Design a protein with these regions (language model features):
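Short beta-to-alpha linker loops that shape the active-site pocket of alpha/beta-hydrolase fold enzymes
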Residues: 70-74, 154, 265
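Catalytic active-site module of serine/aspartate enzymes centered on a nucleophile-bearing elbow/loop
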Residues: 258-292
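N-terminal cap/lid segment of alpha/beta-hydrolase-fold proteins
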Residues: 1-21
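Alpha/beta-hydrolase-fold enzymes
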Residues: 105, 109, 114-115, 119-209
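Alpha/beta-hydrolase active-site loop
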Residues: 85-105
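Short beta-strand/loop motif that positions the catalytic acidic residue
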Residues: 224, 230-232
């Protein structure tokens, strides 16, 4: 695996990894992690005997040019210089276009899919929504992505009292500590920047993806025409239940879109559970090959 370090528009250094280099313009897949983790999330499945690699290697074996992102404050990318310096919208407005532009430059514009888990999926969709809203009058420019797949990405559903309390507690704890202590709580291998997780949680508490300038990202999904596959874990009862993932699929304006519910898989299990090899991962591969 090779790594290149690139600069976002605000000067933040991002790490972008490539599983293997190709020169034949084969379709590519950019894997984008969510909160509390990094690009290594895609490299290993935790519930099997080991040795077979994770979803990244599975996609590579299927013939795709696989790229792995480290969003700001994660993995090999730059860390937040001070608490609350960055927000979730920095992932959307700065990191997403920087990563995609670099890949398209290196691959001579080969077809590229964004495959994101949880908030990493939302970041890609929100970027496309913003791009669609800012597009010039017809004819529109070619879309930057040929497909989007999200694993466990929920819409801004109405939270019950317990979930609302937990989300509000997450925001308060993050602001008090300057970070969310995911490692100490054993829910991830990286602590999350307070501003990033805070904005994402606030969107869910408020029931809408509304940016700091008032732009309604969720409403803007209607302008996203890129083919879209949403995947939900049938055993995910808390983070991204199927009903919440269905909200996103229903809102996206693409003619080609679908929701797949994978029985028995949890939120993180969509990527980390070895059982994903038997259904979830092959289904994603089939959809990508039909689309790219």
């Amino acid at each position: 695996m090779s790594t290149r370090h690139i600069s976002a528009p605000d000067g933040v250094e991002l790490a972008l990894h490539r599983l293997r280099a190709f020169r034949d313009r084969r379709p590519g897949v950019l894997l984008v992690h969510g909160a509390f983790t990094n690009h290594r999330f895609w490299l290993h499945a935790t519930d099997g005997a080991g040795g077979n690699g994770g979803l990244a290697h599975f996609l590579g074996a299927a013939g795709f040019d696989v790229w792995l992102a480290d969003l700001r404050h994660h993995g090999d990318s730059a860390r937040e210089p001070r608490p609350l310096a960055w927000t979730f919208e920095d992932w959307v407005l700065r990191d997403a276009p920087t990563l995609v532009t670099r890949i398209r430059e290196e691959t001579d514009g080969a077809p590229l899919a964004w495959l994101g888990h949880s908030a990493g999926g939302a970041a890609g969709l929100c970027w496309l929504a913003r791009s669609a809203a800012a597009a010039p009058p017809p004819p529109p420019p070619p879309p930057p992505l040929a497909a989007v797949v999200t694993l466990g990405t929920p819409g801004p559903r109405s939270l019950g009292p317990l979930r609302r309390t937990l989300a509000a507690s997450t925001i308060a704890m993050s602001r008090a500590l300057g970070r969310f202590p995911a490692r100490a709580l054993r829910i991830g291998n990286e602590d999350e920047a307070a501003g990033i997780i805070g904005e994402w949680m606030e969107w869910n508490v408020r029931g809408g993806w509304v940016g700091t300038d008032g732009f309604d990202y969720f409403a803007g999904l209607a302008g996203v025409k890129t083919p879209y596959l949403g995947v939900a874990g049938g055993a995910d009862r808390f983070f991204a239940p199927p009903a919440a993932c269905r909200q996103v699929v229903a809102r996206v304006g693409a003619e080609r879109k679908a929701l797949a519910i994978e029985p028995g898989l949890s939120h993180r299990g969509l990527v980390l559970d070895e059982r994903g090899r038997s259904s979830c991962w092959p289904n994603v591969v089939v959809w990508l090959k039909e689309t790219l």
